């Protein structure tokens, strides 16, 4: 099992990144809550990973800390929640918001996440409420700054396209993704800033 990668960040295409370790490039999918904290392309990164083996693919999911990964593993233990849905859940809101929503049995907030209907939200609450006690939600994710570091400033059109693509990868519908990105877009925003504002507006 691959549990940790330390190497050079080669590419960032939310929610996926490419990291080179000893000459080998690893494709890693990462929740946006973690993605915002990545260093610039060309810099060293340390990523804690969850390795998934399927019949048709081998996938890596990445996190900045061991505790973030542990929360992801708790989320995907819930009945009907796989890694892709877990990625969307932890991208659609911060860890603190997720833990609080589960503890408060806030179904109306959970159903706003991509791929989460009422039944899934209810299962998350029932199955995870006791398991999440004492997690210290405020420490799970480091708060992201408003200015996401980027190596080069993309054009507005490119940034919006990248943001829409990222939302689609997280499970949002095309019309919803395009609409919300257009609503939050402002001149000079990077794709990561657009994604963050779009996700905020939908929860």
From Swiss-Prot:
UniProt-annotated stretches for the region Domain II: 65-143
GO cellular component: cytoplasm; Holliday junction helicase complex; Holliday junction resolvase complex
Membrane-spanning ranges: none
Subcellular location: Cytoplasm
Region spans: Domain III: 155-203
Keyword DNA-binding attributed: yes
Protein task: The RuvA-RuvB-RuvC complex processes Holliday junction (HJ) DNA during genetic recombination and DNA repair, while the RuvA-RuvB complex plays an important role in the rescue of blocked DNA replication forks via replication fork reversal (RFR). RuvA specifically binds to HJ cruciform DNA, conferring on it an open structure. The RuvB hexamer acts as an ATP-dependent pump, pulling dsDNA into and through the RuvAB complex. HJ branch migration allows RuvC to scan DNA until it finds its consensus sequence, where it cleaves and resolves the cruciform DNA.
Name used for this protein in its record: Holliday junction branch migration complex subunit RuvA
Organism: Vibrio atlanticus (strain LGP32)
Gene: ruvA
